[in-house]
Amino acid sequence: MRNILASMTLLLAAALFADVAQALDSSGMPVVVTPLASRAETASGQPITLPQKNVQVLVSTYDIAAGATLPVHKHPFPRYAYVMAGTLQVTNVETGKSNTYKTGDFIVEMIGQWHQAINVGTDPVKLLVIDQVEEGTKNTVLRQ
């Protein structure tokens, strides 16, 4: 009797799950979710802290020519980047530590620390960049 009840419970759960899955995908085509990254810290090991006032999300793409060097800068708020193409080396100029990112990598940039980036590859770098800033502010400060 226990086996029958357990089997019935599993069949009912499977039927309910199938209905929910079908409701989520009304086209009849399968939906595949592939996790790309999960981070709780920046590239330099800081905890990710969000702005305390009204948050604005800014999304942009960056195209960085082969051999190009970005100026030394910092970000007062969280910045995330997905490397769509190319190879980028980011160096924390305060510590000298460098990280190299390639196509498919996800970057959680350091917050409030001076750094610069160099396209170390032979092809252009293309980044999808997402900033979370206090509304009305910018997220890049150039070092003078």
Please describe what each predicted stretch is:
Residues 52-55, 69-80:
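A short beta-loop-beta micro-motif enriched in histidine and acidic residues
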Residues 45, 62-68, 76, 112-114:
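N-terminal post-signal-peptidase region of extra-cytosolic proteins
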Residues 64, 95-112:
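Short acidic-glycine-tyrosine-enriched beta hairpin
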Residues 76-95:
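Glycine- and acidic-residue-biased ligand/ion/polar-headgroup-sensing regions
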Residues 69-71, 89, 107-118:
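Histidine-centered metal-chelating micro-motifs
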Residues 4-5, 14-58, 91, 100, ...:
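A short, N-terminal "cap"/entry segment at the start of jelly-roll beta-barrel domains
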Residues 72, 81-82, 107-109, 126-129:
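Structural recognition of the beta-strand scaffold that forms the well-ordered cores
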Residues 112-137:
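Ligand-binding loop in jelly-roll beta-barrel domains
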